[in-house]
Amino acid sequence: AEVLTSEQAEELHKHVIDGTRVFLVIAAIAHFLAFTLTPWLH
């Protein structure tokens, strides 16, 4: 495997962080909807 330069590594890291944020937002919305639309934990 070729070694990433620091610039490439930073770019890759940004994509990973963005993907994680998107996933967390979607998960949070899904949990919120599940909480409000079902008797779950009421």
UniProtKB/Swiss-Prot annotation:
GO cellular component, one term: plasma membrane
Gene3D superfamilies: 1.20.5.250
Bilayer-spanning residue ranges: 15-37
Gene Ontology biological-process annotations: photosynthesis, light reaction
MF-aspect GO terms: bacteriochlorophyll binding; electron transporter, transferring electrons within the cyclic electron transport pathway of photosynthesis activity; metal ion binding
Binding locations of a bacteriochlorophyll: H13, H31
Membrane topology: Single-pass type II membrane protein
InterPro entries, A to Z: Antenna_a/b, Antenna_beta_CS, Antenna_beta_dom_sf, LHB-1/5, Light-harvesting_complex
Residue spans, topological domain Cytoplasmic: 1-14
Keyword annotations from UniProtKB, A to Z: Antenna complex, Bacteriochlorophyll, Cell inner membrane, Cell membrane, Chlorophyll, Chromophore, Light-harvesting polypeptide, Magnesium, Membrane, Metal-binding, Transmembrane, Transmembrane helix
Pfam name, any one: LHC
Residues in the Periplasmic compartment per record: 38-42
Cell compartment(s), UniProt: Cell inner membrane
Keyword tRNA processing: no
Subunit architecture: The core complex is formed by different alpha and beta chains, binding bacteriochlorophyll molecules, and arranged most probably in tetrameric structures disposed around the reaction center. The non-pigmented gamma chains may constitute additional components.
Entry function: Antenna complexes are light-harvesting systems, which transfer the excitation energy to the reaction centers.
Family per record: Belongs to the antenna complex beta subunit family.
NCBIfam families: pufB_517_ASD
Protein name: Light-harvesting protein B-800/820 beta chain
UniProt organism field: Rhodoblastus acidophilus
Phylogenetic placement of the source organism: Bacteria, Pseudomonadati, Pseudomonadota, Alphaproteobacteria, Hyphomicrobiales
